[in-house]
């Protein structure tokens, strides 16, 4: 999924978000990360720092849900997926529920995956929800969110010039520029497709039918809603992504052959509408 750029104004999240937090972290450098062990340790520390800043920012907005009946649906699924994916990622993974009017999920540097309450209302079965989460943990596995953050930070530094990066106004200048670039922050088609395929593998490792992501594509295509998760939007080639998933399934019948492609085989979920939520403070 792409990092969130603009959230609906009718309630919940207003994430000019983790991208803006880049300006508070001077440890991110203008040069690409080197291959030395020391530089890799520095990069991991930078990622942890950025992840913590994102979390603190969302917590300050009071949109992270501490307790809700929705967790009774989310936690069993997310726990199984985290157990399956964690060996492939070097920082602890954690799944959080956040309040928003848009069905969405997104992974951020540092290992956090945020799932909006509206996605639980939209998803019709466990497999669709699992497919979304598996797609997101795949962005962590491939370090996509951190690489995108570093790339954007480097581009800004080149564009703004070294002179303005000195003094107390540097962060403000970077922030203003980032606001103007939020709409362009997108994962590439290849990155999204890779997350689809890795996500399918994670789903099977967690015990979930990997066809759930295909069904979710179809659900949004058939929906009257104009709101959809970022990783399903702005990609006119969704059909090619579905085709790539089907080809992936066919390439390994030992892994995927036991799962039904029929939506009728899915496990429905039922969540209480307008479920009460207590927010972290």
State where each predicted segment sits.
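C-terminal capping/extension segments of zinc metalloprotease domains
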Residues: 3-6, 18, 30-53, 76, ...
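Bacterial N-terminal signal peptides
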Residues: 14-29
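Catalytic-site beta-strand/loop segments enriched in glycine and acidic/polar residues
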Residues: 38-40, 131-134, 140-141, 171-188
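N-terminal targeting signals for Sec/Tat export/insertion, comprising classic cleavable signal peptides
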Residues: 44-72
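Conserved beta-strand segments that form the floor/walls of ligand-binding pockets within enzyme
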Residues: 114
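Short pre-active-site segment immediately N-terminal to the catalytic Zn-binding motif
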Residues: 117-131
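Catalytic Zn2+-binding segment of zinc metalloproteases
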Residues: 127, 137-153
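Post-HEXXH active-site segment of zinc metalloproteases
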Residues: 146-176, 214
């Amino acid at each position: 999924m792409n990092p969130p750029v603009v959230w609906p104004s009718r309630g919940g999240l207003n994430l000019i978000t983790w991208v803006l937090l880049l300006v508070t972290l001077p440890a991110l450098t203008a040069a690409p990360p080197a291959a030395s062990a020391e530089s890799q340790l520095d990069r991991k520390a930078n990622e942890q720092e950025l992840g913590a800043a994102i979390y603190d920012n969302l917590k300050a907005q009071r949109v992270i849900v501490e307790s809700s009946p929705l967790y009774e649906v989310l936690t069993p699924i997310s726990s199984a997926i985290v157990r399956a994916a964690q060996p492939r990622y070097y920082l602890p993974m954690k799944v959080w529920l956040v309040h928003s009017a848009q069905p969405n999920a997104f992974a951020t540097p540092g290992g956090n995956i945020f799932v909006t309450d509206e996605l639980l209302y939209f998803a019709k079965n466990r497999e669709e929800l699992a497919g979304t989460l598996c797609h997101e943990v795949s962005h962590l596995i491939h370090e996509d969110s951190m690489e995108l953050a570093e790339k954007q930070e480097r581009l800004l530094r080149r564009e703004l010039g070294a002179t303005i990066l000195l003094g107390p106004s540097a962060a403000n200048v970077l922030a203003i520029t980032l606001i103007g670039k939020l709409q362009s922050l997108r994962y590439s088609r290849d990155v999204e497709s890779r997350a689809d395929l890795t996500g399918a593998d994670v789903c099977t490792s967690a015990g979930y039918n990997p066809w759930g992501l295909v069904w979710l594509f179809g659900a949004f295509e058939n929906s009257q809603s104009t709101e959809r998760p970022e990783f399903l939007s702005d990609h006119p080639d969704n059909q090619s992504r579905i085709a790539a998933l089907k080809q992936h399934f066919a390439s390994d019948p030992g892994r995927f052959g036991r799962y039904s492609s029929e939506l009728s085989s899915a496990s429905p979920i039922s969540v209480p509408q307008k479920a009460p939520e207590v927010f972290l403070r």
